[in-house]
Amino acid sequence: AMSMLADRFPSRQLGFAAGFYYMGVPIGVAASLLIAGYLGPAIGWRACFYLLGGIGLLLAVGLLFLGETPRKGVDAAQPEKLKFREIIKILRSSLTQSPALMCTIAGGVAFHFILGAAAFDQLWFVNERGFERAEIARHSGWLAAAGGILGNLLGGWLGDKWQQNFKTGRPMFLFWTSLLLSPFAVAYRLVPADNILFDLGIFLGFVQLGLFYGPTFSTVQELVPPRIRATVVAFYILSLNLIGLGIGITGGGILADYMTAQGHGEPYTVTLLVFTVLSMLAIPLMYVAGKRFHADRARLFGSGAPME
């Protein structure tokens, strides 16, 4: 689905389109928290899962009525049929010849370390910050909705504007926003729940999550040949989930259990701080990706690279 956006939108609007598409993430996260917070005490957690799954199935039915979009840069009359081995060869070539693409993907994976570890956020809220489960689910749900939607819209739109008006690509926009927001990501893990930095940190965390999607997914799509765009986007999503989230949630669980066994008073605080810092590896990677973007795109498409 994500790769279809490059066929429907020009390059100058691709970041906003990707950010708008990925508003589904904060909306979904917020909806799950709000349903758990408001309905969980009444209907139980199993019924909440069934309700959320049913909503997803109903929305998926609408895809049956969505028409296909002609592929840009691909001959619709004579579509090219690539063997799996050829696709892998082109994918490997695209990665090795484009530092911007490699750094964008690696930066996205690093950014997802904390998203995986954030699976323990609700335990942290309850066990180490003294919240009641339903109360914090409702509270964080509203913050997730507001921050996530704002971040997605701003990230896509401002990322597009950045690339149009500066000599660097959209990842450089993420470099600067990450530098600005990272101190808040650390600070709110250290303060008590009644400190203003606590709610602000949760809100800005979801803003930062929203800022990520538009610039990175549009960058990945612009740095690969159209004929394997869907494959590369799929590889990127696989990397984010299998490596980024996988390391975050598995490593986070191991570290939290270890800290608990050692008798540490706040094992989840330490765990989440460690993975917050690890996720900051994305910052220098986005800097390199932003600096290299235009040169790598020109190499891919030639000096007359289309920048619609």
Describe each PLM feature range:
Residues P99-L153, L209-Y213, F217, L245-G252:
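Extracytoplasmic gate region of multi-pass secondary transporters
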Residues G62-F65, F184-L190, L273-P306:
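Multi-pass alpha-helical transporter architecture, strongest
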Residues A1-V25:
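Cytoplasmic helix-loop-helix junction between adjacent transmembrane helices
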Residues R71-C103, E128:
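Juxtamembrane intracellular "pre-TM" segments in multi-pass secondary transporters
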Residues Y21-E68:
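Helix-loop-helix hairpin linking two adjacent transmembrane segments in secondary transporters
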Residues K161-T177:
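Cytoplasmic membrane-interface "Motif A"-like loop-to-helix N-cap segments
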Residues P41-G53, G169-M172, A256-S279:
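A membrane-interface helix-boundary motif in multi-pass transporters
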Residues A1-F9, L211-V224:
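Intracellular juxtamembrane helix-capping segments at the cytosolic ends
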